[in-house]
Amino acid sequence: MFYVTYKMQRAVTAQQINIFDALYGNLPIQLDNQVNQMWYITTQVENPRPIPRLQESLTNLLRVIKTMTNDNPNQYEHFRIPKATHGFRDIYAPAENLKAAQRLIVNWMQTTCKTLPNNAAHAYVPERSALTACKVHQANESKWMLKIDLKDFFPSCTGDFVFSQLKKIYPYCLLSDDSLRELLRFCLLNDALPQGAPTSPIITNTIMIPYDYAIQKKLMSFDEVHYVYTRYADDLLISSKIKFNYNGVVRYLEELLPDNLKIKHEKTRFGSTSGQNWNLGLMLNKDNNITLGYKEKQRLRAMINSLLKDYTNDIKWSAEDRHHAQGKLAYLRYIEPEYHDGMTAKYEQKYGVSIKDALK
């Protein structure tokens, strides 16, 4: 069985269907009464159209990237960065020539294969973000959230798993096994997707298509609860307007997910949306507005106060601390621009200096 992508009529979002859904017209949307269903399937399904010289394009790509990398796909620098909570995250940064080759692979997947991630995926997708994911739950006026993390997501995506998943996705299912495995050689490190490679995000979003689709389809089958599902890389968020049996949902996900993708149970959270951060620090307040939350904004106010106070006393923060502060403020401006502008203006007026100068 393989999965295809179609664009929803008069919309920019996309959905996945398996081939049997397409044949039998089981589309997860309401069709207009004036639209003939078979016409809709044959004209709106986006990717089953033949892709001219697909295999040839991959052969040419492999020739180029082998030359660029001297046929050496194992050129990485390893370093660790602290996680937001505790512990460290392993990052593998490819050498410049390998990174350039991987960007060619990403471009080939986007422009030649044209496989769109499921509309539930919000990480590493143009015009999608943690904010757009949160807006999906906001639009549903969800009051109860289930947050699930997948354990060691990128390292768990082994070469065989990635290969078998891509063979279920159009048009990768049309490629020869040898050429597809050869392509993956330049995307893997120690037989897994390395976090830090340009290719890893688009590959994970692609291989998760069947699972994103299956989760959405299963959740839609429950009559008693209307669920909303989004995924941000390895963070799965399921919400509803009413309290639901989250243990049953977790059990279903454990049955659906493959053996190599394990749920990190110690990080599973369930509760009401009020007063808790659910998606990369974002939350829905009692008025159903997206916010960073009172505690995070309190920390930001203290940070800006300390920054400007030090600056007026000729104490300059380190480049690392200034970069960290810039990132925090940029995220606040993205999520709550009015609050950002009001807060920064208040402290600039208090100290008589600009935050921009203090962060130079």
Predicted segments with their positions:
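Short acidic donor-binding/metal-coordinating loop in glycosyltransferase active sites
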Residues: 150, 233-234
